[in-house]
A protein has these predicted regions:
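Short internal loop-to-helix segment that lines adenine-nucleotide cofactor pockets
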Residues: 56-79, 121, 125, 137-139, ...
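Active-site flanking residues adjacent to catalytic metal/cofactor-binding acidic residues
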Residues: 102, 190, 215-216
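Short, glycine/acidic-enriched loop or turn micro-motifs at the edges of active sites
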Residues: 47, 83-85, 106, 131-133, ...
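Core alpha/beta nucleotide-donor-binding catalytic domains of modification enzymes
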Residues: 113-114, 118-149
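S-adenosyl-L-methionine
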Residues: 1-115, 119, 161-169, 179-181, ...
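Core-facing hydrophobic residues within beta-strands of well-ordered domains
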Residues: 96, 185, 207-210, 241
Length: 279
């Protein structure tokens, strides 16, 4: 009970802080431009996660970018599902040949397009759609305090997903096998706040041809957003990938051992921003 109260208070104060920042800037300053290690970015100051880290720390996801760079080169093709405003996509695009970016949130997508142009990136092809198991229209909530946390309306819509009273809209979702037919990607990164399960079900052909798959792994997303079991989630991982790296543990495992570790993490509620399946 005390833990639940702590998180409710934490979310409450985050929401209040976000609103105060927005109010302080006034109606004529809905965005800010910041120069960072990742590039130059137009950000939403109300976003206290990725945007705030870019503004305050001058960087975001540095370790993740370094990790990804080990699996690609200047001839590689990359697919990022959940590109947000481009804080990872833009620096990664400088390391590869071609990058396809999928972003469902229309507000984030506008910033993504702006940031691609601002950084003179010519090898990113961006799409404002959601990834799912089939072509459909889904209910999608636009979070503001953590705009990267925007997601399809969860099956179990816990307070942690709604504390900032997100607007709910309808957006178009597609199977990426159908939307990006005959596409080959050396590396696929999926970070879409619990919809990874649905996205992977709709991109089996893409996944069978990739060399590296990076997927956000948060037990509460798998349970509450997708409403599935861990085994359902893992059944989507392509069988040809034989190793699993868990960055938060700084360890690479054979796939069978790694799956056992993931089961333990799932039971204890521990996640990782991007577990890596590879060879």
């Amino acid at each position: 009970m005390l833990k639940s109260l702590y998180w409710r208070l934490n979310f409450f104060f985050k929401n209040r802080k976000s609103k105060r920042l927005k109010k302080r800037l006034g109606n004529n300053s809905s965005t800010l431009t910041v120069n960072t290690k990742n590039g130059t970015f137009v950000i939403d100051p109300a976003d206290l996660e990725v945007s705030r880290k870019l503004a305050v720390k001058g960087e975001y996801g540095t370790e993740e970018i370094i990790q990804i760079s080990k699996f690609i080169d200047n001839k590689s093709t990359v697919l990022i599902v959940g590109a947000h405003i481009g804080s990872l996509a833009i620096p990664i695009a400088k390391l590869c040949s071609e990058l396809v970016a999928i972003e469902a949130n229309p507000n984030n997508f506008k910033l993504l397009e702006t940031n691609i142009k601002l950084n003179n990136i010519s090898n990113i092809l961006a799409h404002n759609i959601a990834a799912s198991e089939k072509e459909e229209i889904i209910q999608f909530q636009l979070n503001t305090v953590n705009s990267g946390g925007s997601k399809r309306v969860p099956i179990n819509n816990h307070y942690m997903y709604t504390y900032d009273n997100p607007e709910v809209i309808e957006i178009n979702a597609y199977s990426l096998d159908d939307y990006l037919p005959k596409s080959n990607f050396d590396l696929v990164l999926i970070d879409i706040e619990g919809s990874e399960y649905f996205a992977m079900r709709g991109m089996t052909q893409i996944l069978t041809k990739t060399n590296t798959l990076i997927v956000e792994f948060l037990p509460h997303h798998i349970t509450n957003v997708a409403g599935v079991e861990l085994t359902d989630f893992l059944n989507n991982i392509p069988k040809h990938l034989t190793k699993l790296t868990i960055p938060s543990k700084a360890t690479t495992y054979p796939i069978d051992v790694g799956v056992t570790i993931l089961e333990q993490m799932f039971e204890s509620g521990h996640g990782d921003d991007g577990i890596i399946f590879h060879n």
